[in-house]
Amino acid sequence: MCRQLAGLNPRIVADLHAHTTASDGDDTPSRLAVRAKHAKLDVLAITDHDTVAGVAEAMTIPGITIVAGVELSVSFRDHEVHMLGLFVDPANADLRAVCDRISVSRRRRLRGYVEALASIGLPLPEHRVASVEAISTCPGRRHVANLLLEAGHIRQRSQAFVEVLPKVAGHVPGKDLVSIADAIDVVHRAGGLAILAHPPGEFDGAIYGELAALKLDGVESKHNGVSLTQTDFLKEQATRHGWVCTAGSDFHGADSPDRVPGRIGMTSAEYAAVARRAGR
């Protein structure tokens, strides 16, 4: 009976979506790699927002395979979506140029938030803002939420996203998004697989047909918050278009226990299929 139960819940060995301090995660790359090892993972993809800066440090940790990745901020049908680049070459000049362009806009947006929040009576300490800029290549809204929390303007991080940041969103410059076609192209030029991250629930078969025509390689079919029905739908689309399916925790910090490494991920067979597609 135990063997039968084990067969129903095969071991998760790979997490192909996680963030470090190189973008908006709480763990340094090496600390995250150690955390993944402690979670009994064999493989971890470092997929920071719009940067590959954390990959090299993570690779210094022995005993775990690190997949070089990135999560690009992408424009599709006038909306922002996210695309994972997995098994990329972190030294690829084209990929770095795209990341650098988005990084500059992210830093500009951080300063926009600082100014807008000060204008409504919520100043953020300059030394702490400068610290974020020094540590993170690609600062994001999570950093702003942390700064608001540290300054005592909110009691918990979630308040920032629900109550505070929407008030100033219209006064903050946006990110410099890359078109999804260009994002897929640059990931391919960097030797990687282009995977749609946490696909929006409203995407239908026609939209996935468009993405197939753009040479998308796969979808993240298992992630935090996705329903079994949606996972089944994504797997159907993957079968129809010859895509791979990936899964990951989307880890940012230990404060979200449902998003820690080892909680959501891939079995050995599932990971092997993706690695084969990537030529690994």
Predicted regions: what is each one?
Residues 2-5, 61-212, 268-271, 275:
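Extended substrate/RNA-proximal surfaces in nucleic-acid metabolism proteins
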